[in-house]
Amino acid sequence: MQAFSGKPKLEVRVPHSRGLTLTDENKFGEEAESKQWIGVDLDGTLAQADPWQGFEHIGKPVPNMMKRVKIWIELGYRVKILTARAQDPDLAIPPIREWLSKHGLPDLEITNAKDMDMIELWDDRCVQVVPNTGNPVGPNPEPYRR
C-alpha cells in the first residue's frame, strides 16, 4: 500500500466519444467533434447547492468540478452549463455569466435542454441507465439519495 502525501489527485475522465456519429445530423470526424459537448449542471455540481435565494444567488464553486471543467476546456472540449435555472433565461443567464467570470471560467453556453450532441452529463441528480433497459449502470443509487 502506498502512503499519500498532500492532496489526493483529481480524476479527470476524458469523454470517449470524439469522432463518433453522435450528432443530430450524423456527422463524422472533426465536424462531429465540433458539435459534441459535455453538460455540467450548476447547483450541486459546479456550484454548491444552497437553499433557493433567487436567481442572483449561486453557491460557492465546487473545486474538483471547476478543475475538471477547466481541463476539458484546455483540451478543446465544448462545455455547456445545463441547468433548470435557464428555463427563465432573462433572469438566470446574466448572474450565471457573472459567476462563471468571477470564478475564472470563460463565457460558456448556458441551456436547460440536452440534445444528441451531448456526449456526457455531469449532474448531482443523474442515474445512468443501460440503454433500452431502464436498469442502472452501477449499484442501486437509492442509498445516495437519503
Give the location of each predicted region.
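Catalytic phosphate/metal-binding cores of nucleic-acid and nucleotide-processing enzymes, i.e., regions
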Residues: 2-146
